[in-house]
Amino acid sequence: MVTVGEVLKNKRKNLRRSLDLVSADTKIQKRFIKYIESNEFSPFESEVFLKGFIKIYAEYLGLDVKKILALYRKTH
């Protein structure tokens, strides 16, 4: 099964956007983007922050936020 991190990372790479650019544009720290793309969710203080970052990141990449959050809920 495809994960949220894989979908986001693949889309970012298809758009040829670096982690530094994504971080600068979204104001999400690079380390958090790496955690999300690696499906490492334990470093986040709360699920509210995690879901907020996923939403911002998905919107930035032009993905359907509802589908991405549903995928997150389905796999966690």
Language model segments and positions:
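Cytosolic/nucleoplasmic/matrix-facing N-terminal domains/tails
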Residues: 1-76
